Amino acid sequence: MYSVIIVAAGSGRRMNLDINKQFIKLREKEIIAHTIQVFYENINIDEIVVCIKKEEEDFFKENIINKYNFKNIKIAYGGKERQDSIYNGLKKLDKNCDIVLIHDGARPFVDHRIINESIKVAKEKKAVVVGVPVSDTIKIVSDGTVKETPERNLLWAAQTPQTFEYNLIIDAYEQAYKNNYYGTDDSMLVENIGQSVTMVMGSYENIKITSPEDLNIAEQILNMEKRDEVNSRRRII
Protein backbone atom coordinates (compact mmCIF):
# COMPACT_ATOMS: atom_id res chain seq x y z
CA MET A 1 0.00 0.00 0.00
CA TYR A 2 1.39 3.39 -1.05
CA SER A 3 0.36 6.46 0.93
CA VAL A 4 1.12 10.17 0.75
CA ILE A 5 1.14 12.82 3.46
CA ILE A 6 0.65 16.32 2.05
CA VAL A 7 1.71 19.08 4.43
CA ALA A 8 -0.50 22.17 4.21
CA ALA A 9 -0.49 23.59 7.74
CA GLY A 10 1.70 26.62 7.03
CA SER A 11 0.82 30.29 6.71
CA GLY A 12 0.97 33.13 4.22
CA ARG A 13 3.50 35.13 6.21
CA ARG A 14 6.11 35.46 3.44
CA MET A 15 3.30 36.23 1.00
CA ASN A 16 2.19 39.13 3.21
CA LEU A 17 -1.31 37.66 3.18
CA ASP A 18 -3.84 36.88 5.87
CA ILE A 19 -4.67 33.47 4.39
CA ASN A 20 -2.76 30.21 4.23
CA LYS A 21 -0.63 30.26 1.06
CA GLN A 22 -2.10 26.85 0.17
CA PHE A 23 -5.43 28.54 -0.57
CA ILE A 24 -4.03 31.10 -2.99
CA LYS A 25 -5.40 30.44 -6.46
CA LEU A 26 -3.50 29.56 -9.62
CA ARG A 27 -5.76 29.68 -12.66
CA GLU A 28 -8.84 29.86 -10.43
CA LYS A 29 -7.77 26.72 -8.53
CA GLU A 30 -6.16 26.68 -5.10
CA ILE A 31 -2.51 25.63 -4.86
CA ILE A 32 -3.34 22.76 -2.49
CA ALA A 33 -6.05 21.54 -4.86
CA HIS A 34 -3.53 21.39 -7.71
CA THR A 35 -1.20 19.37 -5.48
CA ILE A 36 -3.84 16.93 -4.25
CA GLN A 37 -5.09 16.43 -7.81
CA VAL A 38 -1.74 15.03 -8.98
CA PHE A 39 -1.62 12.38 -6.26
CA TYR A 40 -5.37 11.73 -6.54
CA GLU A 41 -4.97 10.89 -10.23
CA ASN A 42 -1.88 8.73 -9.77
CA ILE A 43 -2.90 5.08 -9.91
CA ASN A 44 -0.11 4.05 -7.53
CA ILE A 45 -1.34 6.17 -4.63
CA ASP A 46 -3.76 4.29 -2.38
CA GLU A 47 -4.16 6.76 0.48
CA ILE A 48 -3.93 10.53 0.91
CA VAL A 49 -3.55 12.34 4.25
CA VAL A 50 -3.51 16.14 4.28
CA CYS A 51 -2.10 18.02 7.29
CA ILE A 52 -3.97 21.28 7.90
CA LYS A 53 -4.54 23.75 10.68
CA LYS A 54 -7.39 22.67 12.92
CA GLU A 55 -9.08 26.05 12.56
CA GLU A 56 -9.04 25.69 8.76
CA GLU A 57 -10.72 22.28 8.68
CA ASP A 58 -14.21 23.50 7.77
CA PHE A 59 -12.84 25.80 5.07
CA PHE A 60 -10.69 22.99 3.67
CA LYS A 61 -13.57 20.53 3.56
CA GLU A 62 -15.95 22.97 1.89
CA ASN A 63 -13.60 24.73 -0.52
CA ILE A 64 -11.22 21.92 -1.43
CA ILE A 65 -12.58 18.44 -0.71
CA ASN A 66 -16.22 19.10 -1.55
CA LYS A 67 -15.60 21.65 -4.29
CA TYR A 68 -13.32 19.33 -6.29
CA ASN A 69 -15.13 16.14 -5.31
CA PHE A 70 -12.09 14.50 -3.73
CA LYS A 71 -13.04 11.23 -2.05
CA ASN A 72 -11.51 9.44 0.95
CA ILE A 73 -9.10 12.21 1.90
CA LYS A 74 -7.92 11.88 5.50
CA ILE A 75 -7.16 14.95 7.60
CA ALA A 76 -4.46 15.36 10.24
CA TYR A 77 -4.02 18.51 12.29
CA GLY A 78 -0.87 20.57 12.01
CA GLY A 79 1.51 20.83 14.94
CA LYS A 80 3.85 23.50 16.24
CA GLU A 81 6.55 22.61 13.71
CA ARG A 82 6.43 20.93 10.29
CA GLN A 83 7.89 17.80 11.86
CA ASP A 84 5.02 17.68 14.37
CA SER A 85 2.46 18.00 11.57
CA ILE A 86 4.00 15.11 9.66
CA TYR A 87 4.10 12.93 12.77
CA ASN A 88 0.37 13.57 13.20
CA GLY A 89 -0.06 12.54 9.57
CA LEU A 90 1.94 9.35 10.06
CA LYS A 91 -0.38 8.35 12.89
CA LYS A 92 -3.35 8.63 10.49
CA LEU A 93 -1.93 6.18 7.94
CA ASP A 94 -3.41 2.76 7.37
CA LYS A 95 -1.36 0.12 9.17
CA ASN A 96 -1.04 -1.78 5.89
CA CYS A 97 1.04 1.06 4.46
CA ASP A 98 4.30 -0.16 2.93
CA ILE A 99 5.69 3.05 1.45
CA VAL A 100 4.90 6.63 2.46
CA LEU A 101 5.61 9.77 0.45
CA ILE A 102 5.83 13.09 2.29
CA HIS A 103 5.15 16.15 0.15
CA ASP A 104 4.86 19.91 0.53
CA GLY A 105 1.37 21.14 -0.27
CA ALA A 106 2.93 24.24 -1.83
CA ARG A 107 4.68 22.16 -4.55
CA PRO A 108 1.84 21.75 -7.08
CA PHE A 109 4.10 20.86 -10.02
CA VAL A 110 5.23 17.45 -8.82
CA ASP A 111 4.72 15.04 -11.71
CA HIS A 112 3.86 11.37 -12.09
CA ARG A 113 7.37 10.43 -13.17
CA ILE A 114 8.73 11.74 -9.86
CA ILE A 115 6.04 9.98 -7.81
CA ASN A 116 6.44 6.64 -9.57
CA GLU A 117 10.24 6.70 -9.56
CA SER A 118 10.29 7.59 -5.86
CA ILE A 119 8.09 4.62 -4.98
CA LYS A 120 10.05 2.24 -7.19
CA VAL A 121 13.42 3.19 -5.70
CA ALA A 122 12.11 3.34 -2.11
CA LYS A 123 10.92 -0.26 -2.39
CA GLU A 124 14.54 -1.28 -2.93
CA LYS A 125 16.53 1.37 -1.04
CA LYS A 126 14.06 2.23 1.78
CA ALA A 127 14.70 6.00 1.74
CA VAL A 128 14.52 8.38 -1.23
CA VAL A 129 14.78 12.13 -1.70
CA VAL A 130 14.11 13.93 -4.96
CA GLY A 131 16.21 16.92 -5.84
CA VAL A 132 18.09 18.78 -8.53
CA PRO A 133 21.76 19.73 -8.94
CA VAL A 134 22.36 23.32 -7.89
CA SER A 135 23.22 25.70 -10.70
CA ASP A 136 24.79 28.44 -8.56
CA THR A 137 28.12 28.34 -6.77
CA ILE A 138 27.44 27.90 -3.04
CA LYS A 139 29.47 29.64 -0.34
CA ILE A 140 29.68 28.66 3.33
CA VAL A 141 29.70 31.95 5.25
CA SER A 142 30.30 32.78 8.91
CA ASP A 143 30.19 36.31 10.33
CA GLY A 144 30.07 37.74 6.83
CA THR A 145 33.21 35.92 5.71
CA VAL A 146 33.38 33.13 3.14
CA LYS A 147 34.82 30.08 4.90
CA GLU A 148 34.51 27.49 2.16
CA THR A 149 33.29 26.94 -1.39
CA PRO A 150 32.05 23.34 -1.75
CA GLU A 151 32.39 21.56 -5.08
CA ARG A 152 29.23 22.40 -6.97
CA ASN A 153 28.98 18.97 -8.61
CA LEU A 154 28.40 17.46 -5.15
CA LEU A 155 25.53 19.78 -4.21
CA TRP A 156 21.83 19.07 -4.80
CA ALA A 157 18.79 21.06 -3.72
CA ALA A 158 16.37 18.71 -1.96
CA GLN A 159 12.70 18.79 -2.92
CA THR A 160 9.67 16.69 -2.08
CA PRO A 161 8.22 14.11 -2.13
CA GLN A 162 10.58 12.35 0.21
CA THR A 163 9.72 8.68 0.26
CA PHE A 164 10.33 6.00 2.87
CA GLU A 165 9.57 2.49 3.93
CA TYR A 166 6.78 2.90 6.49
CA ASN A 167 8.50 1.18 9.42
CA LEU A 168 11.71 3.11 8.79
CA ILE A 169 10.14 6.57 8.89
CA ILE A 170 8.07 5.67 11.96
CA ASP A 171 11.25 4.55 13.73
CA ALA A 172 13.10 7.69 12.62
CA TYR A 173 10.37 9.94 14.00
CA GLU A 174 10.12 8.06 17.29
CA GLN A 175 13.89 8.25 17.76
CA ALA A 176 13.88 11.95 16.91
CA TYR A 177 11.29 12.73 19.57
CA LYS A 178 13.07 10.52 22.08
CA ASN A 179 16.25 12.54 21.55
CA ASN A 180 14.51 15.92 21.10
CA TYR A 181 15.92 16.13 17.58
CA TYR A 182 14.36 18.36 14.93
CA GLY A 183 15.51 18.23 11.32
CA THR A 184 14.78 20.62 8.47
CA ASP A 185 13.45 17.77 6.33
CA ASP A 186 12.38 14.17 6.81
CA SER A 187 15.49 12.63 5.31
CA MET A 188 17.57 14.20 8.09
CA LEU A 189 15.66 12.15 10.65
CA VAL A 190 16.37 9.00 8.68
CA GLU A 191 20.04 9.91 8.24
CA ASN A 192 20.17 10.54 11.99
CA ILE A 193 19.47 6.85 12.71
CA GLY A 194 22.13 5.67 10.28
CA GLN A 195 20.03 4.91 7.19
CA SER A 196 21.47 5.94 3.83
CA VAL A 197 19.21 8.00 1.57
CA THR A 198 19.11 7.70 -2.23
CA MET A 199 18.74 10.79 -4.41
CA VAL A 200 16.38 10.67 -7.39
CA MET A 201 16.29 13.39 -10.04
CA GLY A 202 13.46 15.81 -9.41
CA SER A 203 12.47 18.71 -11.62
CA TYR A 204 13.39 22.38 -11.77
CA GLU A 205 9.67 23.03 -12.22
CA ASN A 206 8.89 21.31 -8.90
CA ILE A 207 9.14 24.61 -7.04
CA LYS A 208 7.80 25.41 -3.59
CA ILE A 209 5.57 28.47 -3.74
CA THR A 210 6.49 30.69 -0.79
CA SER A 211 6.70 34.24 -2.19
CA PRO A 212 4.93 36.53 -4.68
CA GLU A 213 7.84 35.96 -7.07
CA ASP A 214 7.19 32.22 -6.91
CA LEU A 215 3.58 32.85 -7.91
CA ASN A 216 4.76 34.58 -11.07
CA ILE A 217 7.02 31.63 -11.89
CA ALA A 218 4.16 29.23 -11.21
CA GLU A 219 1.95 31.04 -13.70
CA GLN A 220 4.68 30.68 -16.33
CA ILE A 221 4.99 26.95 -15.60
CA LEU A 222 1.23 26.54 -16.00
CA ASN A 223 1.43 28.24 -19.37
CA MET A 224 3.75 25.56 -20.73
CA GLU A 225 2.80 22.59 -18.60
CA LYS A 226 1.64 19.29 -20.07
CA ARG A 227 0.54 16.62 -17.63
CA ASP A 228 2.00 13.17 -18.30
CA GLU A 229 -1.23 11.20 -18.20
CA VAL A 230 0.46 8.03 -19.47
CA ASN A 231 2.82 7.68 -16.49
CA SER A 232 -0.02 8.30 -14.04
CA ARG A 233 -1.73 5.13 -15.21
CA ARG A 234 1.22 2.78 -14.71
CA ARG A 235 0.77 0.77 -11.57
CA ILE A 236 4.01 -0.17 -9.81
CA ILE A 237 4.03 -3.83 -8.82
UniProtKB/Swiss-Prot annotation:
Pathway: Isoprenoid biosynthesis; isopentenyl diphosphate biosynthesis via DXP pathway; isopentenyl diphosphate from 1-deoxy-D-xylulose 5-phosphate: step 2/6. Its EC number is 2.7.7.60. Keywords: Isoprene biosynthesis, Nucleotidyltransferase, Transferase. The record marks R14, K21 as: Transition state stabilizer. PROSITE patterns: ISPD. GO terms for molecular function: 2-C-methyl-D-erythritol 4-phosphate cytidylyltransferase activity. CDD domains: CDP-ME_synthetase. GO terms for biological process: isopentenyl diphosphate biosynthetic process, methylerythritol 4-phosphate pathway. SUPFAM superfamilies: Nucleotide-diphospho-sugar transferases. InterPro entries: IspD, IspD/TarI, IspD/TarI_cytidylyltransf_bact, ISPD_synthase_CS, Nucleotide-diphossugar_trans. The record marks R152, K208 as: Positions MEP for the nucleophilic attack. It catalyses: 2-C-methyl-D-erythritol 4-phosphate + CTP + H(+) = 4-CDP-2-C-methyl-D-erythritol + diphosphate. Pfam families: IspD. Belongs to the IspD/TarI cytidylyltransferase family. IspD subfamily. Catalyzes the formation of 4-diphosphocytidyl-2-C-methyl-D-erythritol from CTP and 2-C-methyl-D-erythritol 4-phosphate (MEP). This is 2-C-methyl-D-erythritol 4-phosphate cytidylyltransferase. It comes from Clostridioides difficile (strain 630). The gene is ispD.
